[in-house]
C-alpha cells in the first residue's frame, strides 16, 4: 500500500463522487479505482443511505392513475422507442405493489377521495408525479365547479410534468428528476 493510500489522499475522486460523470477519461479513472479496490480488498465501502437510494432509483414501480388523455401519452413511454422497462421502471396495477403514482388527467371532486384512498394504500416510501396541465392545476377545466385545481390539494406531489398533453420525453425527464430527488434524500431517520 502506498503512502498516499494510507493517508487517504487521492481517494476523494473515487470514494465520494457525488455527481454522475459523463463517459470519458474521468469516468474511466473512477471505474478503474473501484474495480482495483474490489480486487485488492474484496469489498467496497459505501454508506447505507447511498446503497438504499441506489436500489430505490433503479427499481421504481409506478402505478398509473390515468384520468384523461395524458394517460395515453404515458403508455408511449413504455413502448419500444423509449422502453422504461430497461431502466427498471416497471408499471404495476396495484397500489400495494407500487412506490410511484403518476396522476395523469383532470381530477374531479368526485374522484378526489378515490385518489386519496389509493395513495394511502401505497407502502412507504411513496412518491407522486403530477402529469399534465389538468393534474397540475386544473388545466383547460380550471374554472369548472367540479374540478380540483391541482392534485396537490389532495396528495403531496413530488414532481410536476407540464404540458397538454406532455410528451413521453417530458414524462421520462420527470421520472429522472424524481430519481435525482430520491438520491438526495436520507433513508435513515436521525433524531
Swiss-Prot record:
Q: How is the cofactor bound?
A: Binds 1 [4Fe-4S] cluster.
Membrane topology, as annotated, equals: Peripheral membrane protein
Give GO BP annotations, semicolon-separated. aerobic respiration; electron transport coupled proton transport
Give the record's keywords alphabetically.
Answer: 4Fe-4S, Cell inner membrane, Cell membrane, Iron, Iron-sulfur, Membrane, Metal-binding, NAD, Quinone, Translocase, Transport, Ubiquinone
- What SUPFAM superfamilies has UniProt attached to this entry? HydA/Nqo6-like
Drop me one GO molecular function for this one.
iron ion binding
Where does the protein principally reside? membrane
Q: Which domain of life is it from?
A: Bacteria
Which cofactors does this protein require? [4Fe-4S] cluster
**Subcellular locations according to the entry:** Cell inner membrane
Q: Which reaction does it catalyse?
A: a quinone + NADH + 5 H(+)(in) = a quinol + NAD(+) + 4 H(+)(out)
Q: What is its EC number?
A: 7.1.1.-
Sites binding [4Fe-4S] cluster sit at 69-70, 134, 164
Q: Which family does it belong to?
A: Belongs to the complex I 20 kDa subunit family.
Question: Which function does this protein serve?
Answer: NDH-1 shuttles electrons from NADH, via FMN and iron-sulfur (Fe-S) centers, to quinones in the respiratory chain. Couples the redox reaction to proton translocation (for every two electrons transferred, four hydrogen ions are translocated across the cytoplasmic membrane), and thus conserves the redox energy in a proton gradient.
What is the protein name stated in its UniProt record? Answer: NADH-quinone oxidoreductase subunit B 2
Amino acid at each position: 500500500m502506498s503512502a498516499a493510500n494510507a493517508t487517504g489522499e487521492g481517494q476523494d475522486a473515487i470514494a465520494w463522487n457525488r455527481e454522475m460523470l459523463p463517459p470519458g477519461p474521468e469516468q474511466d479513472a473512477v471505474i478503474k479505482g473501484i474495480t482495483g479496490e474490489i480486487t485488492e480488498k474484496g469489498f467496497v465501502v459505501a454508506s447505507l443511505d447511498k446503497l438504499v437510494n441506489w436500489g430505490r432509483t433503479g427499481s421504481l414501480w409506478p402505478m398509473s392513475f390515468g384520468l384523461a388523455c395524458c394517460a395515453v401519452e404515458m403508455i408511449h413511454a413504455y413502448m419500444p422507442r423509449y422502453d422504461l422497462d430497461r431502466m427498471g421502471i416497471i408499471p404495476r396495477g396495484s397500489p400495494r405493489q407500487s412506490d410511484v403514482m403518476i396522476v395523469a388527467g383532470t381530477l374531479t371532486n368526485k374522484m378526489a377521495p378515490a385518489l386519496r384512498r389509493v395513495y394511502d394504500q401505497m407502502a412507504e416510501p411513496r412518491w407522486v408525479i403530477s402529469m399534465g396541465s389538468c393534474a397540475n392545476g386544473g388545466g383547460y377545466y380550471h374554472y369548472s365547479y367540479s374540478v380540483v385545481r391541482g392534485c396537490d390539494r389532495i396528495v403531496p406531489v413530488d414532481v410536476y410534468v407540464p404540458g397538454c398533453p406532455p410528451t413521453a420525453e417530458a414524462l421520462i425527464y420527470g421520472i429522472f428528476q424524481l430519481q435525482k430527488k430520491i438520491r438526495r434524500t436520507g433513508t435513515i431517520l436521525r433524531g
